[in-house]
């Protein structure tokens, strides 16, 4: 371990000069939000040559790292801010809540200036550089961490970004603030990055995109580059991934590529490729359209909804059509209609028409089917609700999925994990399909087959039993045990069946076909399902999150639910026969 001051001595002996920490603070430093930081916050600088992989940052967990007292860490060179993040260092006599290994491998062999805008003049002396990434072995063992849903080891996550598959690995990126631990921190946006060989066991890779200057790295997607383009993936075997994302310095849509199979990423020198065109441009969805040999971008631009753009080189873009009322995080992919056999496209995202527009749904997960010729999307259906949430948002499908499946992961927005060193998690990977229900093509969500490999021992196996038998058998289920529950039931005519999972209640009426979901007595969603025979349902019960799938995914839910909440782990009420009930424990994806 090398303290920075020790490193200073070593480099001075080699002939390198260092700037000394100033005695006075700067008069009007600004945080990323533009809010002046308090006068007592000082700028402490030290120029070093980076010869290690990580700077070890001893940090305190904060509710909001940009409020007064926040500290700003910067890496500067050549008069530019190359990196920054807001945080709070542990004081001289304070025990840090956690150590964050801040990755500086990008700057190895380079002389940079470390700048700390801090109220603690001695902070530099307590920082260490080394080549070891410190990882708390107990970080994945917290009582509220999900056992089979992905969550970051440390810090905040939100939108899923840029999911793709290549060379045996599934990649997911996500909006991340890795230094705020379990606080709610939707700022200082990085792109976190994790990989998996099987869609269920995940390993964190280095941060893919860091904010620089007063920049933010907001949401986006991955496109597979198909042909040589000057400045993009030169010397890399094609097709190769290109990240498309929103950045704020300068504001616009930016690109990044990887020289080493996705482990590290470099911003394109010609950014931004799409300057600001609306009042809130963000979240580019970019894909290759084979029929027209062109790239297509769908971009949220504020009041005008989604805008479609077209390019042949990922750099020069032409606007082709608009879809009003859509909001944030667009997704777009082809699927075959089960009713007509026609190849259609699915436009997916948040649909948010103004209240004065009558007859329109409003949904944080919505879809519309239509035809697409490479320039114009022509709807053939109305906009419909898709996933019913309420904790499901900003979802993307995997590009280049090896089995040709549309597989989607979303952010389970609003989930709670008290006391943990992280905040928020991802949904299970869900296979999408179009199925015919009630004469129309319906977008359905179901866990991918790979999730079944996480099943442990069977805990309950019942055939042709009553609800009372289920309640009796399930009394012994431990609340902290993650579960996979599948059931098939046949309600009597014009009956109401209730299924209780912790504090959640699903109520199905055979008379109306209506399915409602309530959380601790408050209704949070209602829909209709159209079973042809027994009613099938599946419940994936994890710590902090429950996902439910009815009638082959016709209705899908993702709901925040602590295992310490009141209510039985699983129970059924009503006049019905449970034809089959299988309950398995679920293995911990974080076990070595």
Where do the language-model regions lie?
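Bacterial Sec-dependent N-terminal signal peptides
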Residues: 1-22
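Short carbohydrate-recognition loop motifs
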Residues: 25-36, 515
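Beta-rich accessory regions
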Residues: 32, 41-58, 64-77, 113-116, ...
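Surface loop/turn signatures of beta-propeller and other carbohydrate-active proteins
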Residues: 34-38, 81-95, 124-162, 181-185, ...
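Exposed aromatic-hydrophobic patches
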Residues: 45, 97-105, 221, 333
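Hydrophobic core segments of beta-strands in well-ordered, beta-rich domains
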Residues: 57-58, 114-115, 159-183, 204-208, ...
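Extracellular carbohydrate recognition and processing domains
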Residues: 58-60, 74-108, 119
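Conserved Ser/Thr-centered positions that define the repeating blades of beta-propeller domains
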Residues: 196, 258-259, 308-311, 371
């Amino acid at each position: 371990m090398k303290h920075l001051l020790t490193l200073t001595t070593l480099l001075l002996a080699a002939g390198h000069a260092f700037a000394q920490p100033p005695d006075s603070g700067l008069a009007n430093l600004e945080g990323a939000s533009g809010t002046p930081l308090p006068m007592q916050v000082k700028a402490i600088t030290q120029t070093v040559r980076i010869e290690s992989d990580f700077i070890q940052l001893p940090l305190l967990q904060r509710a909001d790292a940009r409020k007064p007292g926040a500290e700003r860490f910067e890496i500067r060179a050549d008069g530019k801010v190359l990196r920054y993040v807001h945080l709070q260092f542990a004081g001289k006599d304070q025990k840090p809540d956690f150590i964050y290994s801040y990755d500086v491998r990008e700057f190895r062999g380079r002389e940079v200036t470390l700048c700390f805008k801090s109220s603690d003049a001695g902070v530099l002396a307590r920082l260490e550089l080394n080549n070891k990434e410190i990882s708390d072995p107990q970080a994945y063992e917290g009582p509220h961490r999900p056992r089979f849903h992905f969550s970051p080891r440390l810090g905040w996550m939100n939108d899923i970004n840029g999911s793709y598959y290549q060379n045996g690995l599934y990649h997911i990126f996500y909006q991340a603030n890795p230094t705020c631990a379990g606080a709610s921190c939707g700022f200082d946006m990085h792109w976190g990055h994790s990989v998996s060989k099987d869609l269920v066991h995940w390993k964190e890779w280095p941060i893919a995109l860091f904010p620089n200057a007063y920049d933010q790295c907001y949401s986006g997607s991955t496109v597979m580059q198909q042909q040589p383009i000057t400045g993009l993936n030169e010397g890399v075997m094609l097709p190769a991934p290109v990240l498309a994302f929103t950045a704020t310095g300068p504001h616009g849509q930016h690109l990044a590529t990887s020289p080493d199979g996705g482990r590290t990423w470099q911003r394109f020198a010609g950014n931004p490729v799409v300057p600001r065109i609306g009042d809130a441009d963000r979240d580019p969805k970019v894909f290759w359209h084979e029929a027209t040999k062109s790239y297509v971008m769908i971009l949220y631009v504020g009041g005008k909804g989604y805008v479609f753009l077209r390019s042949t080189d990922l750099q020069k873009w032409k606007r082709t059509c608009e879809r009003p009322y859509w909001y944030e995080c667009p997704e777009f992919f082809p699927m075959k209609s089960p009713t007509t056999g026609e190849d259609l496209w699915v436009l997916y995202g948040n649909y948010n028409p103004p209240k004065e527009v009558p007859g329109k749904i409003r949904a944080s997960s919505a879809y519309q089917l239509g035809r697409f010729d490479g320039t114009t999307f022509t709807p053939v259906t109305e906009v419909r609700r898709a996933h019913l949430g309420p904790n499901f948002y900003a979802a993307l499908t995997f590009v280049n999925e090896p089995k040709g499946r549309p597989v989607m992961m979303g952010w389970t927005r609003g989930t709670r994990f008290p006391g943990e060193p992280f905040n928020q998690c991802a949904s299970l990977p869900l296979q999408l399909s179009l199925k015919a229900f009630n004469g129309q093509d319906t977008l359905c969500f179901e866990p991918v087959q790979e999730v079944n490999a996480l099943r442990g021992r069977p805990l309950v196996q019942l055939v042709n039993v009553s609800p009372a038998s289920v309640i009796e058998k399930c009394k012994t289920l431990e609340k902290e045990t993650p579960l996979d529950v599948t059931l098939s039931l046949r309600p009597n005519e014009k009956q109401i069946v209730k299924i209780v999972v912790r504090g959640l209640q699903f109520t199905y009426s055979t008379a109306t076909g209506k399915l409602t979901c309530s959380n601790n007595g408050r209704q949070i969603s209602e829909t209709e399902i159209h079973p042809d025979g027994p009613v099938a349902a599946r419940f994936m019960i994890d710590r902090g999150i429950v996902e439910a799938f009815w009638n082959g995914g016709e209705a899908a839910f993702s709901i925040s639910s602590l295992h310490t909440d009141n209510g039985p782990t699983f129970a059924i009420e009503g006049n019905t026969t449970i034809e089959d009930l299988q309950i398995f424990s679920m293995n911990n994806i974080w076990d070595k």
